[in-house]
């Protein structure tokens, strides 16, 4: 389509993000067809700027965990994440345009923001994205988008550089279990970008089971 090669704000996905991470609390499956990973109107969906609110619409109406889970998705899934000022602390959440969504943030809130759980979790996942090209530019292959759980690969290869990230997301209020068979997981050494723990996947019958904490994320790296 005309102008399909231009990087733009990802409005179709934005509406889904608000439903999944806002008070509607829809399941991860709501995001699947808005990703356009295989076919769609965009020449390159990986260059779209992903977001859940901005100055021209109501801010995301979510509790702290909603923001944390939204950021865990934005900084691990396809696209270029964009965070509107103040959302790193849940500022004026739910407020509409001209009803508070553009209010002055101020130095006092900036100083206090470092103690916000939204900010601390955002800082962590943003740093992990910054350090790993698979999360920035890797192809996304979905394994599971259902209810409170999501699992997908980000696969990057350029020249002699290669990295695979297995992303596990849990937006539920209880720990969630994940298991993968030999057809889903490559044998060899994997390392958690979250904890630093290493895992050796057996080459004879590779399988893996793990648990992701409530409102948590796991990123396993294979290089």
Model-derived regions, located:
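Active-site neighborhood of divalent metal-dependent phosphoester/pyrophosphate hydrolases
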Residues: 52-59
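Beta-sheet entry/capping signal
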Residues: 47-49, 80-83, 164-166
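C-terminal beta-strand-rich structural cap/linker in extracellular carbohydrate-active enzymes
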Residues: 202-223
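Conserved, mostly hydrophobic/aromatic
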Residues: 55, 74, 86-88, 125, ...
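Active-site-proximal helices and loops of the catalytic beta/alpha 8
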Residues: 1-44, 48, 64-65, 73-76, ...
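Asparagine-centered strand-capping/turn motif at beta-strand->loop junctions
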Residues: 168-172
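Short hydrophobic/aromatic beta-strand or adjacent loop that forms the aromatic wall/cage
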Residues: 148-150, 163, 214-219
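Solvent-exposed beta-strand/loop surfaces of large extracellular or lumenal domains
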Residues: 191-207
């Amino acid at each position: 389509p005309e102008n399909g090669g231009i990087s733009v704000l990802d409005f179709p996905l934005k509406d889904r993000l608000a439903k999944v991470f806002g008070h509607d609390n829809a399941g991860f499956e709501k995001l699947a067809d808005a990703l356009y990973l295989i076919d769609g109107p965009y020449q390159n969906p990986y260059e779209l700027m992903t977001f859940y609110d901005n100055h021209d619409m109501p801010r995301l109406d979510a509790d702290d965990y909603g923001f944390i889970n939204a950021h865990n998705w934005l900084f691990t899934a396809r696209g270029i994440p964009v965070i509107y000022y103040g959302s790193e602390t849940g500022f004026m959440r739910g407020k509409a345009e001209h009803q508070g969504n553009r209010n002055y943030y101020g130095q006092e809130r900036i100083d206090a923001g470092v103690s916000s759980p939204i900010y601390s979790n955002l800082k962590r996942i943003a740093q992990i994205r910054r350090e790993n090209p698979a999360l920035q530019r890797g192809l996304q292959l979905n394994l599971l988008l259902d209810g409170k759980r999501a699992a997908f690969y980000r696969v990057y290869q350029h020249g002699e550089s290669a990295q695979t990230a297995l992303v596990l997301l849990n937006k539920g209020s209880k720990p969630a279990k994940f298991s993968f068979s030999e057809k889903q997981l490559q044998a060899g050494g994997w390392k958690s970008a979250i904890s630093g723990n290493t895992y050796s996947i057996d080459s004879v019958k590779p399988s893996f089971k793990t648990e992701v904490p409530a409102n948590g994320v796991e990123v396993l790296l294979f290089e």
